[in-house]
Curated annotation (Swiss-Prot):
Residues 1-14 have a biased composition (Low complexity). Residues 1-26 are annotated as: Disordered. The gene is smim8. It is found in: Membrane. The chain crosses the membrane at residues 49-69. Keywords: Membrane, Transmembrane, Transmembrane helix. This is Small integral membrane protein 8. Belongs to the SMIM8 family. It comes from Xenopus tropicalis (Western clawed frog). InterPro entries: UPF0708. One of its GO terms (cellular component) is membrane.
Length: 97
């Protein structure tokens, strides 16, 4: 029979084994359809692709804002013809002024 002191020394020297789970949904059993519909839950993030996407979306929004601003400026101008037949651009003014 072994002494209690030898059993306690063995228990202290070896750490308890713990099973660690993988973070997120990578360790969960799911269907192929769920993985195909929600790939962002299972794929490791790719920083260069994220940066490219953010820059692309920002440029698209800036371009749309630019088009909106230039179109708005064009609406305030119109082409007028004077009595001599010369064409010139003029800012629109209210009929009531």
């Amino acid at each position: 029979m072994s002494s209690p002191s030898s059993e306690s020394s063995n228990a202290k020297s070896s750490p308890p084994k713990e099973e660690y789970r993988t973070p997120g949904l990578r360790g969960v059993k799911t269907t192929t359809l769920f993985r195909a519909v929600n790939p962002e839950l299972f794929i490791k993030p790719n920083k260069p692709v994220m940066v490219f996407g953010i820059v692309t979306i920002t440029m698209c929004v800036a371009y749309i804002a630019y088009l909106h601003a230039t179109e708005e400026n064009k609406r305030e101008l119109y082409e007028a013809v004077d009595s001599e037949g010369n064409r010139y651009t003029r800012r629109k003014s209210s009929k009531w002024d």
